[in-house]
């Protein structure tokens, strides 16, 4: 501490000491919200469906499936929102000084996560996300990390983040992003591109389709759209990626939602996001029981449905969901005819469900 006299400490002097001198104890994280297929691995290596509200310990891993999400809260009130098809290992969860200082280190095995770190602004907090290609050390509060195929992307939404590899490091300031490939040094930070602009988005739907459009951008190579029940997308309903600025939100149940969208450039760097709240209010009546689809019909894409003709003024809505509760729609057809062929759907480890509505 460079004291002029080691035997005298003046009133008001600030001293630095190693964390190893402080009492340390294991901390726990908490799954505060889950939506869809969220799995947690116990310390013996077995996987099971996660439950909202359960504690997560050092050494445990969480993975999130298609059209699913999870929110994790840590000892210093930091929050991590896991996006679809992401996987995170709790590498270190510790607290010092009676819980005032936290040391949180996470391993992002793959996928996209969004972080709001140290929201209380306490000094001495440590929050790191380790990817296969780099380490993101937080010196700010809000940032995004995405790890795919040996490449990591990082964007700082508020504060600053140090992105480091064995080959070098960069300091990514607020409003900038960087990328790094395995075994290389991070690229110089680039300004995050502006969010896409909606074209007169509807705030309430009383009929199909639930369509949204954005202003076309020639330099954009892709569009990502998400629908969730909250603005953070911790209660995600669906995600869609396309090469055009158009999105049909599908056969959503009645209720309030948020639509979030961003663009991707030719290097895969995401833009800022745009958020739009909307409501669905389309009266409908379930026709018969919900049908559990046999896996071989789904994988072959050869299932045909014959429907009874309806009286004038009534229409069919046919819908397929990933879950039995109808919260995760993957396909729908409004104003369906009396003969309908279902498309081929991606394989999953539990049955799809078919819903037939009259509206």
Model-identified regions with their sequence ranges:
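Short beta-strand segments within Ig-like beta-sandwich modules, predominantly Fibronectin type-III
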Residues: 236-243, 330-337
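Conserved aromatic anchor
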Residues: 208-220, 301-313
């Amino acid at each position: 501490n460079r004291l002029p006299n080691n035997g005298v400490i003046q009133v008001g002097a600030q001293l630095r000491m190693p964390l190893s001198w402080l009492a340390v104890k294991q901390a726990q994280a908490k799954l505060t919200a889950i939506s869809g297929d969220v799995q947690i691995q116990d310390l013996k290596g077995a996987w099971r469906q996660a439950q909202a509200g359960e504690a997560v310990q050092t050494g445990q891993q969480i993975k999130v499936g298609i059209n699913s999400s999870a929110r994790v809260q840590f000892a210093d009130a930091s929050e991590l929102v896991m996006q679809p098809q992401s996987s995170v290992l709790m590498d270190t969860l510790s607290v010092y000084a009676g819980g005032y200082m936290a040391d949180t280190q996470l391993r992002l095995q793959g996928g996209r996560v969004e972080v709001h770190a140290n929201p209380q602004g306490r000094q001495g907090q440590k929050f790191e996300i380790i990817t296969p290609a780099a380490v993101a050390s937080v010196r700010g509060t809000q940032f995004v990390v995405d790890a795919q195929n040996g490449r990591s992307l990082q964007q700082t939404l508020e504060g600053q983040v140090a992105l480091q590899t064995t080959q070098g490091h960069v300091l990514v300031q607020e409003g900038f992003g960087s990328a790094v490939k395995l075994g290389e040094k991070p690229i110089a930070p680039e300004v995050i591109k502006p969010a896409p602009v909606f074209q007169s988005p509807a705030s309430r739907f009383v009929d199909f389709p639930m369509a949204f459009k954005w202003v076309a951008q020639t330099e954009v190579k892709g569009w990502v759209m998400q629908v969730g029940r909250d603005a953070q997308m911790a209660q995600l309903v669906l995600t869609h990626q396309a090469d055009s600025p158009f999105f049909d939100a599908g056969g959503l149940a009645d209720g309030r939602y948020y639509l979030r969208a961003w663009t991707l450039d030719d290097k895969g760097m995401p833009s800022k996001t745009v958020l739009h709240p909307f409501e669905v209010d389309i009266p409908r009546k379930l026709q018969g029981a919900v049908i559990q689809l046999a896996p071989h019909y789904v994988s072959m894409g050869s299932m045909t449905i014959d429907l009874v003709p309806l009286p004038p003024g009534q229409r069919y809505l046919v819908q397929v969901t990933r879950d039995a509760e109808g919260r995760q729609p993957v396909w729908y057809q409004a104003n369906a005819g009396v003969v309908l062929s279902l498309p081929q759907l991606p394989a999953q480890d539990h049955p799809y469900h078919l819903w037939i509505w009259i509206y």
